[in-house]
A protein has these predicted regions:
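A conserved FAD-binding loop/helix module that cradles the flavin
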Residues: 51-91, 95-97, 105-106
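Noncatalytic linker/hinge segments flanking ATPase motor cores
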Residues: 22-30, 45-54, 85-94, 132-141, ...
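C-terminal auxiliary extensions adjacent to catalytic cores
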Residues: 104-168
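Short, surface-exposed, charge-dense and proline/glycine-enriched linear segments
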Residues: 8-14, 78-79, 88-94, 107-125
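Short C-terminal domain-edge/linker segments immediately following a structured domain
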Residues: 36-42, 61, 76-81, 124-129, ...
């Protein structure tokens, strides 16, 4: 018996109002500097999340990590100071694989998804490894997101910048 699976990713288009505004490109995404998140067309506009054209995932973690860079850069910009924040394209996400297991990936502009411990040098989770612990981490993340991250509470040992992989 011959089996095949075709996996396709639909074209990710930005919102129609972005096109109507004149800010967007042919994909209705706003072109920005990928490090500062500042519009390439209007220096008073910064764009975060799904609306910008950075070469990164459109996952919520990207927007979350963009916030810190944006806040610092925006405050420096309105104070007429040079912007010092630089977004590194950091993204991470859990991928459910079924049967109570999941994988976890972590990457940025420089480093593709890689194996290794997460979030500390000893784990307890493993990147690019299917496990029950990663699945439980995904389930726990909902609570952490709503009760810790949104309140901007710091998590010990967790950096918003992607750390160099141990094997790089």
């Amino acid at each position: 018996l011959f089996r095949s699976l075709l996996v396709t990713i639909p074209l990710n288009m930005g919102a129609d109002f972005v096109a109507r505004s004149g800010l967007g490109n042919e994909l209705n995404l706003v072109p920005v500097d990928k490090q500062t998140l500042q519009s390439k067309k209007f220096d008073s506009i910064f764009v975060l999340g799904d609306a910008n054209d950075i070469p990164a995932s459109k996952a919520g973690s990207v927007a979350h990590f963009e916030i810190d860079v944006f806040v610092d850069n925006f405050l420096e910009h309105i104070a007429d100071e040079p912007m010092t924040g630089s977004f590194d394209g950091h993204a991470n996400c859990f991928i459910e694989t079924g049967h109570g297991k999941a994988m976890l990936i972590d990457f940025n502009y420089e480093y593709e998804p890689h194996e290794g411990p997460f979030p500390f040098s000893f784990g307890p989770m493993k990147l690019l490894e299917e496990s029950r612990l990663n699945h439980l981490g995904k389930l726990a993340f909902r609570h952490v997101y709503w009760n810790v991250l949104l309140k901007a509470w710091p998590l010990p040992g967790i950096s918003r910048q992607k750390k160099k992989p141990l094997n790089a």
